[in-house]
Amino acid sequence: MSKDPGRILIFDTTLRDGEQSPGASLNLEEKLAIAHQLARLGVDVIEAGFPFASPGDFKAVNKISEVVGGENGPIICGLARASTSDIKACYEAIIPAPKKRIHTFIATSDIHLKHKLRKSRKDVLSIVPEMVSYAKSLVDDIEFSCEDASRSDPEFLYEVIQLAITSGATTINIPDTVGFTTPSEFGKLIFDINKNVPNIDEAVISVHGHNDLGLAVANFLEAAKNGARQLECTINGIGERAGNASLEELVMALHVRKSFFNSFFGRSSDSPTPLTAIRTEEITKTSRLVSNLTGMNVQPNKAIVGANAFAHESGIHQDGVLKNRLTYEIIDAKTVGLNDNKISLGKLSGRSAVRARLEEMGYDLSREDLNDAFARFKDLADRKREITDRDLEAIVSEQVQLPESRFQLSHVQVSCGSTSKPTATVTILNTETHTEDTSVAIGTGPVDAVCEAINELAKVPNELIEFSVKSVTEGIDALGEVTIRIRNKNKIYSGHSADTDVVVAAANAFLNALNRLIFSEKKECIHPQFDNLENSEKKVFSNPKN
């Protein structure tokens, strides 16, 4: 049997695999904000990125290692392909972390070996011990992944795993890379690994999976029943294609059905000991932060964190819930931190009162960020009678989200109606030339007119592919959250903003997306799975401090 920590370890890969969602690119400040919140959430491991990908990724992993990792905090992990240059860059990035891990991988399925790596099984059996041993010479905590394990020949898989453990791997990850397997198959795969790998008791078995068939969470729970003790997941289930296994769904399944799962951990069914170290009351806030910063909206009927997760429309259901919530709810909304507390703050409230409430909510802002957030709070308080925690979350998350900006909104005004053509006048500041320019444009609606005017000024080719707006809270004076996604050269960029005036929010969201596009074009990135290893070997990003 594999090494058993006595509970499930939660390995969060939102900042690595989650960020590979189209349009979900994050800047350094956003990654730090998410990493800090993941630490508050109580995850065991944060996979902070792929350091070899770009100088920006290296810097983000390095900074997270420096300020988020701690003796009592999460392990900070970096991803590296099975190459010396990748592993070296990863090690240099995670050096500041008191608890650090190198996560290296190579494909083991025949389809990947033939068509992607163009290597033989013999080649893999030579590479694995060499690269794992090299990583082990740098740090003690080594995770090794057999990419596309669920489509690999089992006998070859056992051989690779045994070699990796012999060479120093302390965690063995079994990925369902393309979301191909079913729960019973995945559970059997983990069972068979435990049965057929002689030294498996020297490593923790981890699982990683994608949701292409909608089975990722079910697969993971079956894997846990069969000995997997680390689950690799993302907030809101974001990730490439159909996404990854959802952290909140996994954690709450283990929380709500603890009496069922306890026996698979050698416990009595009524054992009160939690199966994970997650602070469930932080789930909703973490979900909202990731959604706001990535621009990836959560579907309303998403389990645990969707807007409708605790809503009841049917009269019969409403009646039952009013009499006893347990009739139709298996989770108390407060367990996941869902509340809409109205706070006694208004336009006369001072900076210290706002800071105190933000600290109660778990936000620790710098003096500069607090000043900016307070200014936005005062502006909102002048326009909105009641301020909720949700309003404060929107203010803070937007403050964190602001990307590097070449263009900033100075002024926007629209004219529209049933008998007039929607017209927008927009003035933007170019931060490079320190000049302001104004344009007037006509569109099919006020938002379209605003975007047309901005495009005339910015002159950055793009195609607007998504515009969405939602109310942060109830009431006609509620903040409106706008998310805009644009495309350029087959890449997608997101912008997000909130304001009581949705036209102003739309203008800022569009400019945020444009700024991301502009600055991302200056950064060359490597994809850990799709880019050819040999062609990228020459490109090494070293620690800027060295």
From Swiss-Prot:
The keyword DNA-binding does not apply. Residues 408-546 are annotated as: Regulatory domain. It is found in: Cytoplasm. Residues 8-271 form the Pyruvate carboxyltransferase domain. GO terms for cellular component: cytoplasm. Keywords: Amino-acid biosynthesis, Branched-chain amino acid biosynthesis, Cytoplasm, Leucine biosynthesis, Manganese, Metal-binding, Transferase. GO terms for biological process: L-leucine biosynthetic process. It catalyses: 3-methyl-2-oxobutanoate + acetyl-CoA + H2O = (2S)-2-isopropylmalate + CoA + H(+). One of its GO terms (molecular function) is 2-isopropylmalate synthase activity. Pathway: Amino-acid biosynthesis; L-leucine biosynthesis; L-leucine from 3-methyl-2-oxobutanoate: step 1/4. Its EC number is 2.3.3.13. Its cofactor is Mn(2+). It comes from the Bacteria. Mn(2+) binds at D17, H208, H210, N244. SMART domains: LeuA_dimer (SM00917). Pfam families: HCS_D2, HMGL-like, LeuA_dimer. Belongs to the alpha-IPM synthase/homocitrate synthase family. LeuA type 1 subfamily. Homodimer. Catalyzes the condensation of the acetyl group of acetyl-CoA with 3-methyl-2-oxobutanoate (2-ketoisovalerate) to form 3-carboxy-3-hydroxy-4-methylpentanoate (2-isopropylmalate). This is 2-isopropylmalate synthase. It comes from Prochlorococcus marinus (strain MIT 9515).
